[in-house]
Amino acid sequence: IKKGHSSSAAISVLTARAFNRVYDLRLTVRGEMELAYQGEITTPSRCGRMDQGCAFGDRAVLMEFDGDRLATEEIRPAKDLHFVIVDLKAKKDTVEILKRLNRSYPFAEGEVEKGVQELLGPVNKRIVQQAKEALQAGDACRLGALMGEAQAFFDRYAAPACPEELTSPALHRVLAHEALRPHVWGGKGVGSQGDGSGQLVA
């Protein structure tokens, strides 16, 4: 649906799960995810591995990647948290975004590429760890603040790699909307970002 909701991955996971159940293949959820990923990367979609996380359903799951290795950990919030997913009624090109961000690997050729590596490396690792702790504590205020921080770093480091897609005017209008501020703790873009969807902590 081109909104950053992993919709193509959801179809791939559903297909893998259907084959698993119909033919009693005895695959784990991780096995279904791997089949779905291998199937999807043969298409123009070229999704990342995170998209197959939809296989876990409505549970909060931390996914850590190291090359082709994937580690998962279920996170149990201390209390309910409320998220709002917003269709920005604009457009994004995930394939182009990922193509441009991937130019930063394996070697950074300039300052923009170094910034992307900084963002997706140490900055991301620190914010994700803090977000995990906020989720476990059920701390919506802290989680919202971390989303805002993550978005600011994304704007600083990733947007220059693909400004046509990552300037995201519709997303930033929502995040800066004065009438919305009393009702949310913070928010950010979804997935590879762009003007597909936004996510807010209410």
PLM feature spans:
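C-terminal nucleotide
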Residues: Y37, I41, C54-G189, Q199-A202
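Gly/Ser-rich oxyanion-binding loop with an adjacent helix/lid
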Residues: I1-R76
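Glycine/serine-rich anion-binding loops at beta->alpha junctions
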Residues: I1-T15, H183-Q199
